[in-house]
Amino acid sequence: MLGALAKKIFGSSNDRRVKGFRPRVAAINALEPEISALSDEQLRARTQTFRDQLAAGTRLDDLLVPAFATVREAAKRVLGQRHFDVQMIGGMVLHESGISEMKTGEGKTLVATLPVYLNALEGKGVHVITVNDYLASRDAEWMGRVYRFLGLTVGTIVHGLDDGQRKEAYACDITYGTNNEFGFDYLRDNMKYELSQMTQRGHHFAIVDEVDSILIDEARTPLIISGPVDDRSELYVAVDTVMPRLTPEHYDLDEKQRQVSLTEAGNEFIEEELRAEGILKEGDLYDAHNVTIVHHVNQALRAHTLFTLDKDYIVKNDEVVIIDEFTGRMMQGRRYSEGLHQALEAKERVTIQPENQTLASITFQNYFRLYKKLAGMTGTASTEADEFAEIYKLDVVDIPTNKEVERVDEDDEVYRTVEEKYEAIIKEIDKAHARHQPILVGTGSIEKSELIGELLKKAGYTLLDYSDPNALTDVYKAARENRVTKRFAVLNARFHEQEAYIVAEAGVPGAITIATNMAGRGTDIKLGGNLEMRIEKELGQMPEGPERAAAIEALKAEIAENRAKVLASGEKADPEAGRKKDLPGGLYIIGTERHESRRIDNQLRGRSGRQGDPGRSKFYLSLKDDLMRIFGSDRMDGMLQRLGLEQGEAIIHPWINKAIEKAQQKVEARNFDMRKNVLKYDNVMNDQRKVVFEQRRDLMGQDSVRETVDEMRHGVIDDFVAVHIPENAYAEQWDAEGLKHRALDVLGLDLPIEEWVKEEGIADEEIRERLRKASDESYAARVERNGAEVMTYVEKQVVLQVLDHLWREHLVTLDHLRQVIGWRGFAQRDPLNEYKSEAFELFNGLVTALREQVTAQLSHVEIMQQQPEGFADGGFESAGFSEPQLPPMFPEHRDPVTGENEFAFAGSGSDGGAGGAYGFAARELSADAAVLERNPDDASTWGRVGRNEPCPCGSGKKYKHCHGRFATEA
């Protein structure tokens, strides 16, 4: 109470911060008459003037006022849109590395032009991140008109681009793209073997649109590039044979949380059985070198206790097929990850499909923290303000709306059963549709969307077919004639262009649109219809002229008339029904369930009431909804029965809303803790990832790594001497024979070490020096024999390839370690500290193995066919070996709503994954088709050819060493 009083008197901290931006807004407004008087050429010339000022030492912040004023004028001339004062404030928040919370329809896309232009003046690249390819392309084209008018370059990163196209896009002043594309490009760049092959040029400044979706909702689902792994089917089968011998006393099962763990008795039993089967060969089960076996045991245990045949999965055509728990449908093509699917295959004795190994991964949390400067925009961030501040050091500023919000948010209606809830929803849709009020029905999943669609069909509605060119024509005609169409649309999140079009037309009188809570973000729902979309669809082929101008005016008039109908579509007061006042028209939001996050509910509500429009929202709940079960539906069910509620009746009260919000706050706090915990563990891997990636980049940037190779060889010798000639040990205790074998195996040197140790007074330092001298002489001879230039190339490639191989194995080991480290808590040890300690030891082991394996390979390398002349002009193939190739790679990122790999279906519905020229599975068909169309004798049919692809002429050489070389010379 006192806090509310103080806020009323002094204002909130947010109000004070917004007020602090007002003087600069006034300064920008004061410049407007002067800048409006400039010609287009003079306005464009200001960009170079600003750059000259920066070069002379002017601070970027000092250019904010004139730069923002310049962008506002450019937008007025190019787009016909003028930034409001509150949009200027939003732009300042973004420039200062904050999050601008702006309500739906307040023009976030236009706001971004202000800080993007200002920061692009530095020439270091600005990245604008959107949630899908359609929005990236749309915004780059739409706002790109402003940037290009002012002399800046704009690029777009979308699926299917090759390296050359990506590099061009990243070289632009401003680059638009999706979070997935930016993240995967970073991972792939750090798997390249030449600096010239890398596409990104650094991480200077990024603005993340829908920042809450990307940095909160997707924070726990890492981007993963995976590749085929060695066949482990025998180990899956061997471990599976032990599982049927377990009894309930051997494990603790929590079906509600879907978790299972071995008891102490279970651990002892499993260890004995694994030893008897010859699987556990040495040490205890939970020793670090046995993490792979522990991983297999855990997955086999889950397969046998948590998953039931014909309930969770079925066996069909020698395959384990997952059954969706909500719909009961088979989910062809979906597989459980982390070896669980292979464990189920072993359990059912079907063919075990190969699993993929993680080649590289990163979470969005750690990717976006690479940027020196980060900012974000969204309509809903306040509920997660603490998380943005703690994890990303980003402050959330709530930007005032240009006009007051007129939407009415009604209290929830709570029903006893799901059936009663859905019956009430269909009745409400019927009533609103009869008034021609547009309705947006929000659901928590694609399956629930389909369920609502089926219920509407049973009620006599038909699904709108957007593949029919006349479908929308009929809708517009019905709106003009005040007819009820009884048609509805369902958003399909896999086709973003269609999705945006459906959302854009969801404000037409009588429109019924069913969507998941997340679908369609980024596209406004305008009451009456979307003029730009209709011009594009209906008048796209009509040439400029009086006829087109008249048609546009007719569309404007029709949309204005439709808007008036929508505004008048509200529900009138009905005292008998307990409704004392009129409810507004505008877009009617119907929520079919509460999400566990208040933010997602607010996003759904925020679709209505844009820019001062009226609107209405209401949530329909049942006691069987997930959140209501958490809240305690048994108690509430009893309360409803005592109140005498009959079937089909609902309880509506503000107290219910408050209770649900408290439940949501608890869930949000739990999820925040989980994300923080994930980040703590991921930070351990992230620190190691940064070291490895920096070392790789440093190695690629060197003309020669000979000095590094020599240091590695000397380090290996030091390790050998330390192991076989321990410090302070007597000469009789030295292991001369072991040292001799290691020198022969790794260094390729057959040395009389046993004779050396017999010499009077010889010390370990002397033996070390002799080994170094012998290895240096041997290696120098090898370099001379194979050719210095060839060996310089080979050294770099061997170091990089061995590092990559060991890093991939290290990732798998860390992943397995992370899964079992929680058990240390039972021994009163902190699992996180244990993980840090063991991860550090494993990383030290990686460094030691890197030295030894690089030394061993280079100490035995021989070039089979040495042709120095060919090497000089034909490439490394003529010298007897080929350049390293990237392994087969598959991008993976699980959608936090559906759980699907967003790239698993890319080959069937769009142009593939994030792969471009990388040979991802989703790209294979289209890539092969392109090759088949090339005529070896006609270079004009070749199209863009990758430098490392086989030359289309059929010579067998790489393109860069064949016709690509001629093209370069030309």
From Swiss-Prot:
Catalyzed reactions per annotation: ATP + H2O + cellular proteinSide 1 = ADP + phosphate + cellular proteinSide 2
Q: What is the lineage of its organism?
A: Bacteria, Pseudomonadati, Pseudomonadota, Alphaproteobacteria, Hyphomicrobiales
User: Superkingdom of this entry's organism?
Assistant: Bacteria
* Name assigned to this protein: Protein translocase subunit SecA
| Compartments, as annotated in UniProt | Cell inner membrane; Cytoplasm
GO CC annotations on file: cell envelope Sec protein transport complex; cytosol; plasma membrane
The residues that the entry says bind Zn(2+) are C951, C953, C962, H963
User: Which NCBIfam families has this protein been placed in?
Assistant: PRK12904.1, secA
* InterPro entries in alphabetical order: Helicase_ATP-bd, P-loop_NTPase, SEC_C_motif, SecA, SecA_CS, SecA_DEAD, SecA_motor_DEAD, SecA_preprotein_X-link_dom
- Primary place of residence? membrane
Q: Which SMART domains match?
A: SecA_DEAD, SecA_PP_bind
Cysteines engaged in disulfide bonds, as pairs: none
- What PANTHER family does the record tag this protein with? CHLOROPLAST PROTEIN-TRANSPORTING ATPASE, SECA INNER MEMBRANE COMPONENT OF SEC PROTEIN SECRETION SYSTEM
What is known about its subunit structure? Monomer and homodimer. Part of the essential Sec protein translocation apparatus which comprises SecA, SecYEG and auxiliary proteins SecDF-YajC and YidC.
